Structure formats: C-alpha cells, structure tokens
Amino acid sequence: MEYQFTHSIHGIVAKCSMEHEVFARWLNTEIIGHTQNLHNILAEIEKCRAAFPNHYECVFEGQEYSLYFDCDEVIVKVNNLAMAIDEVIVEEGLQLYDQESVAFCGLEDFERFLQAYHKFSSTYH
C-alpha cells in the first residue's frame, strides 16, 4: 500500500494509491480529528494478534465508512454501499471492483499506514 500525508492550513490530508484510495478517504473522514478512534483501532489490532491462531474479527462503523478486519485482511467500505460484500453474486469471469466504495489490504500494511499517520500527525501538532 502506497500512501502520502500532507499538512496545510486546513490540516492533515492522507492520499493513497488508486486501489487503496478508500483507505485515505476513511482516514480523512473517520480518524483525522478523532484521535481516540485511532487508539481504539490500534488496540483492537493488538487484540487480534494476541488471539492468533484463533479467529478474531473487529468492526468499526463510522459515519460514512466502516472498517472490518481479522488477523489477515482489512476491508473498508462506504456505509451506503448498496450490496454487502458477502451478498454479491459474481458471474464467472466478471470481477466486482468499485475503487470508490471498497478497498482491501493486509493487516500489517494497514497497521503501518496507521502508525505512519500517527507519527506524521505527532510531528505537525
């Protein structure tokens, strides 16, 4: 996952590579300005690691985006997405990909993204 943080008079803004741009919008919407949410998510990631190899899932429902993760994968999606990811029936050879509504990444990449944001925000605040 590629990402970049910038700081201006309007505050911090996260940007991600095209296939992960929903993560940037999630961070900009649900985390920036809500530091406690960041700490809660990082704490849940630690609980997830401690539970391994047992299955552990966590959901954070925000105002605009929801975050789902287990010990392997993280999913962020727009709350008003018409169909739940599990309910989508895809015909053979057809892929469902809506880069503006849902994105996936590994838990380790996601944790590095959050830690990099935390470090950046600590430097500029």
UniProtKB/Swiss-Prot annotation:
It holds the Pfam family UPF0231. It comes from the Bacteria. NCBIfam families: PRK05248.1-2. The lineage of its organism: Bacteria, Pseudomonadati, Pseudomonadota, Gammaproteobacteria, Pasteurellales. Belongs to the UPF0231 family. This is UPF0231 protein HD_1708. Coiled coil: none annotated. InterPro entries: UPF0231 (IPR008249).
